[in-house]
From Swiss-Prot:
Keywords: ATP-binding, Cytoplasmic vesicle, Disulfide bond, Endosome, Glycoprotein, Lipid transport, Lysosome, Membrane, Nucleotide-binding, Repeat, Translocase, Transmembrane, Transmembrane helix, Transport
Enzyme class, spelled out: translocase
Function: Catalyzes the ATP-dependent transport of phospholipids such as phosphatidylcholine and phosphoglycerol from the cytoplasm into the lumen side of lamellar bodies, in turn participates in the lamellar bodies biogenesis and homeostasis of pulmonary surfactant. Transports preferentially phosphatidylcholine containing short acyl chains. In addition plays a role as an efflux transporter of miltefosine across macrophage membranes and free cholesterol (FC) through intralumenal vesicles by removing FC from the cell as a component of surfactant and protects cells from free cholesterol toxicity.
Protein species of origin: Rattus norvegicus
EC number: 7.6.2.1, 7.6.2.2
Record lineage: Eukaryota, Metazoa, Chordata, Craniata, Vertebrata
Keyword flag Ubl conjugation: no
Post-translational modification: N-glycosylated. Localization at intracellular vesicles is accompanied by processing of oligosaccharide from high mannose type to complex type. N-linked glycosylation at Asn-124 and Asn-140 is required for stability and efficient anterograde trafficking and prevents from proteasomal degradation. Proteolytically cleaved by CTSL and to a lower extent by CTSB within multivesicular bodies (MVB) and lamellar bodies (LB) leading to a mature form of 150 kDa.
Protein name: Phospholipid-transporting ATPase ABCA3
Amino acid sequence: MVVLRQLRLLLWKNYTLKKRKVLVTVLELFLPLLFSGILIWLRLKIQSENVPNATVYPDQHIQELPLFFSFPPPGGSWELAYVPSHSDAARTITEAVRREFMIKMRVHGFSSEKDFEDYVRYDNHSSNVLAAVVFEHTFNHSKDPLPLAVRYHLRFSYTRRNYMWTQTGNLFLKETEGWHTASLFPLFPSPGPREPSSPDGGEPGYIREGFLAVQHAVDKAIMHYHANASAHQLFQKLTVITKRFPFPPYISDPFLIAIQYQLPLLLMLSFTYTSLTIIRAVVQEKEKKLKEYMRMMGLSSWLHWSAWFLMFLLFSLIVVSFMTLLFCVKVKKDIAVLSNSDPSLVLAFLLCFAISSISFSFMVSTFFSKANMAATVGGFLYFFTYTPYFFVAPRYNWMTLSQKLLSCLLSNVAMAMGAQLIGKFEAKGTGIQWCDLLNPVNVDDDFCFGQVLGMLLLDSVLYGLVTWYVEAVFPGQFGVPQPWYFFLMPSYWCGNPRTVVGKEEEGGDPEKAFRTEYFEAEPEDLAAGIKIKHLSKVFQVGNKDKMGIRDLTLNLYEGQITVLLGHNGAGKTTTMSMLTGLFPPTSGHAYIRGYEISQDMVQIRKSLGLCPQHDVLFDNLTVAEHLYFYAQLKGLSVQKCPEEVKQMLHTLGLEDKRDSRSKFLSGGMKRKLAIGIALIAGSKVLMLDEPTSGMDAVSRRAIWDLLQQQKSDRTVLLTTHFMDEADLLGDRIAILAKGELQCCGSSLFLKQKYGAGYHMTLVKEPHCNPEGISQLVHHHVPNAMLESHAGAELSFILPKESTHRFESLFAKLEKKQKELGIASFGASVTTMEEVFLRVGKLVDTSMDIQAIQLPALQYQHERRASDWALDSNLCGVMDPTNGIGALIEEEEVLVKLNTGLALHCQQFWAMFLKKAAYSWREWRMVAAQILVPVTCLTLALLAINYTSEIFDDPPLKLSLNEYGTTVVPFSVPGTSRLGQQLSEHLRDMLQAERQEPREVLGDLEEFLVFRASVEGGGFNERCLVATSFKDSGERTVVTALFNNQAYHSPATALAIVDNLLFKLLCGPRASIEISNYPQPRSTLQVAKDQFNEGRKGFDIALNLLIAMAFLASTFSILAVSERAVQAKHVQFVSGVHVATFWLSALLWDLISFLVPSLLLLVVFRAFDVHAFTRDGHMADLLLLLMLYGWAIIPLMYLLSFFFSAASTAYTRLTIFNILSGIATFIVVTIMRIPAVKLEELSRTLDHVFLVLPNHCLGMAVSNFYENYETRRYCTSSEVATHYCKKYNIQYQENFYAWSTPGIGKFVTSMAASGGIYLTLLFLIETNLLWRLRTFVCAFRRRWTLAELQNRTSVLPEDQDVADERSRVLVPSLDSMLDTPLIINELSKVYDQRAPLLAVDRISLAVQKGECFGLLGFNGAGKTTTFKMLTGEETITSGDAFVGGYSISSDIGKVRQRMGYCPQFDALLDHMTGREMLVMYARLRGIPERLIDACVENTLRGLLLEPHANKLVKTYSGGNKRKLSTGIALIGEPAVIFLDEPSTGMDPVARRLLWDTVARARESGKAIVITSHSMEECEALCTRLAIMVQGQFKCLGSPQHLKSKFGSGYSLQAKVRSEGKQEVLEEFKAFVDLTFPGSVLEDEHQDMVHYHLPGCDLSWAKVFGILEKAKEKYGVDDYSVSQISLEQVFLSFAHLQPPTTEDGR
């Protein structure tokens, strides 16, 4: 029941996601229909010709050899060979045969057949042998007679001589080779008569090659040998002639030939995109950790697969139903693509193929954890599994049944074989029917359609088993691997016996063993929800082991929130991942609600709620759908779901976002939703990994309240980087450092252990005197310590024992506040932040902020002294201009940034190295780029050579028994006695051979026509020969009629007649058994045959196109991923020129393209393909390939703009390449076949398709090959030249000729299109289009803007904001050039269903050395402002100027003057931190000699040195932010934009970042910063504005805003109430009494937060009162500060409506 419910839920999820991905779904439907459409279109275009009357053929005389043989061969006469030469009888018969013919001929005996074969192979005169008669008897003596039962075989030349070019449209038709003795019928049957225009039956040439004449002559000679006189008498009154069966009225349909060859390929291409989509969808879920997240929520793996399978199956069912409809529906009078086949069987076949394709895609997906890589390799494998068909098709008749079945283990081959069978049944005229399911097409074959269906289903099962096994043993990055033999373990099938936690483990206090003073006693009265015992995790990094967690032992209790703290990389996320079963612990145990994590994960997951660090949301599900989905997944009933979801939406405050898709939510809302998912359906164990990162202050508070409410009966584990959050929420706080647990206890316990006393924090004014402050503090409190000096903050530690001196100190500070330049100050007891920093410092001195700051500055001082010999007044910590400023100062003096050509070259080099690094790091991709084309071509050439490695034909007995039981009609219209006699003998003879003689009383030919039209295709297998005995004057004419649909019926028919005559002469025991055993090929012929490959040029081109389709689309991957993560935007902002960016990429990609191209030449050389390797044609081929590269790469760049995910781009562009190359190439090639009669249309299409590089390449390669071979043939001999002229076979002397088959137009087209695509690319990217875009957008949006601005509330504007506006609106020219950033009435409207005014007329001027803070709630318009300022979004109205240049008109110049750190890290995973900084340093134009020093400084200043040489993808979130900030700061741009730079950083890193930013500011840079951390804004900003609904609501320095919008003090106190409410109430009463007018702002658990209004309150006084009250009211901890910025910020909260879209 549960299973069904989960299955239904997953199906609903998959269906909803599919429904929302409209384009993908449409493409999946459209592509199969497109390929079916191509067939329908061809069906309509290819005219079938109706032949209304029966076709009747004339008699064929076999008494004489054809005329061709009356001309002697070059250099001699024809030879008639016989074996064995020592037998007189053999010689006699052969001589008799020679005398029978009128031409000059000599007899040549060979002692054994081997001698004869050697003669044929190696003797140059062997081509003169007309035929050899080989008797299959052992003649011991020369005089031994010939027995009555004669057995012999005729050996004619392998290559036919009397062969005329027939106009089949393909010069070198494979079928012209050999005698087809391996098969009885053609591989592909034809619906009309075979070779309708040849009365002699055409191939393999029994009549025209003289085979029947020789056969009849030998048979007559045998009769004369045994009964000379009576034979002589018989043949005087009897003549034997042959005749072809008449053919009933039929429709001549060249389309059936096209379909037999192309149906498999088109079906395979139809499912390519579906296959790639499946692989991508499944792996993307794995890559985004969604699959593992669902597993953590209690979903079993097999259900996950079943749901995917059912969804894709249902979808495929729709697709194949449409395809069946298109194939079987009659498009014009009684003609469909498959006119005769049973639609239900066609549907069954396509469905079986779809099922096996789905299973195949599943199997491929298990080997990958990255969607890009999976789609790349998966697509290649999909094609790769089709290639064996190229080997199978030509060898089909030689293969045994088991070989055919084995090759069907690849589903694509099985499908191709099935499609081929459908084509054969269609051509046979019956179509495939259910009754034919177990019957082969004809007697030749032993393979039937039922076996194909069976194999497709078997493949699906096998692929499914591989999927199951691989997923269990290699679950990828996330998941617990099973041992390789897991399926043999009973525990796998029956489950583990439940491990009961041992009594000693239950009772034992885990922390006793190593209890130190830093671990607080455990609560006695609470149950432990999670017990962790000695848990360790070791990671393999390269060859080294890296300790992730070392021996962690910890209890987490129900009803409590346990907070886990640690700097980035301390092991918090690792611990959570082990507890949730994402990866297994290396050693140790953990029990969650009594279940062990490595054994009972299934049980544990039922009660687990998880909110991971990264959002694991489905982009296309709405908020409510997420909650529904996960609630039901955890087991909530459908009935209770709506209420629970409604409740949760209310709790989260997301009611208005109920129906928004998650991809449109802002970062903060996504976090809320993730927490909601963790909480929903009453999860008992919650694990929240940084749940509030990226939220604004209001949202964060809401989440705190939510967690406090929800914790009562749950065990909650939470990690965070916000110390106030830890302090407020944590009942117990555990701190990890370097993978080890350092301490654990309540926040109070930790503060007592680690606290050093009180902290006094001062915010400096620009003219501040830090020295003076320091002296003053030390005067009052001698043992005070300077704690940190970061940004605008100074903080001192005042020891507890000096409390009595504080009042006088504070009084003095208040008095001298102006004089010392103090903006504001506050004091607090030990904070959690301090505890955290102290713990870090004890474990690792590199975490000590002062220790870090000093050496960094010292180092810079030394560098400056040595490198630039500049003196500086560096006075340690107190000097404000250092750090990154170290480089800044020099640059003003010495360092001149590169400009002009030098800058362009430097940028080009930087971009080129970026591409090179990508290839180097993504070596698998490069390997695929090289191997795919080489493999494809090698396989194609192997298949072609394998085909052309023509086997010598086997012997074939010319007897009806080969065909099974057949009907032999005969008629005796004459009255002669001989005729009657013969007919009776015939009846007896046939019955003895188990054949069915049938006497026809009327006209025999009419009977045959009637039977053929009644029986249809089956007639050709049941009736192969017929005979008539009629009188012609004195003579009786015996006619051997043969059904020409079978290859060997002429000789078989004659053999029956000759046998009949022999029996008549010599009695029933007489018989002649004849076989056709063609001669082996001579070495000369073998060499010649190598070239006569039918579709070799076509095959080479086709495989090359398949390879190129995959190769070309890889060039889009980096382009898309750079754009998606905004790295490209940041590079442009850093000053890269468009041409530099794209041309460097093009150059590298052309070099990457050259490597496989050269290897392709090597392959052609290895296979010695003359067309491409002789006469200097290798250079031509290389030119073709490189021109293709030059055309296709820019096209891929252009098309990459349509995609936002690299994997999507890769799959869709591969499909585009297949369509634009293979599909167009096949269509044009089919239309060029003369029989199809569409040459004119093919020429038109060929010209239309010239814009597609893929088409040009395919046609050029194919034409080049064909032209070479035709030219070589036509100039090989006079006869050949005569033939070529006679049949108008054209070739070009100049390969580059314009007209077909020259390749001039393709070459020119590729050369031109490369240039055109590049020009288009530059137009899209450059200012020209940018300006046009700005103009058009602005034009369209201005009226919307005016309308919206009229609507916005007419609130009076704040005075400061108005002053700033007027300052900006009337600027002087000097001030414009001097002011780094001026924003003038900037507005932005987003066109949505309801147009959104995101930014509304903001004006601002940011001066040098100023750090301006943009504050606002999520959705206030901060990020949109940044996007406009950096040129990512167009401006609706207004403008902005950077260094005097306008953003609307001079975006290029503007970008050279700005640094930008976007909200989400715009980093390239494949580079190291150092490489990225070096790249951006080059982009900025820092001279090469200084780059290393500059990068070193930046790394040191941001504490990134230990990580400098690691790949960015291995960085933690905090380190990525540091690197992004470093990139913005490097090269000293005039204006720096930082969008939430410190998100996700731990406190140490955050302070270092502030330091760095402050130094940049002090060196004269203008900085604009947005942040959710008010602390950060106070530390860094000189001025700030609070944005609400796209407008500035207030503006000024932090102190100014605090004084204006909030006066008095802020008091936060934590009371030790121990759950007794009255204790807290007493304290609250005390505050109300002592500070009249005080307002209780906030109350959380035991924490109260008051606003103390006070004009008359002095800080010293407040402090004094609280010190005294501390003991009395049990105040654990309090802090008094001037009103904080956060409170000012929150006072604007009510003005901001609920947010709309991400970051706007």
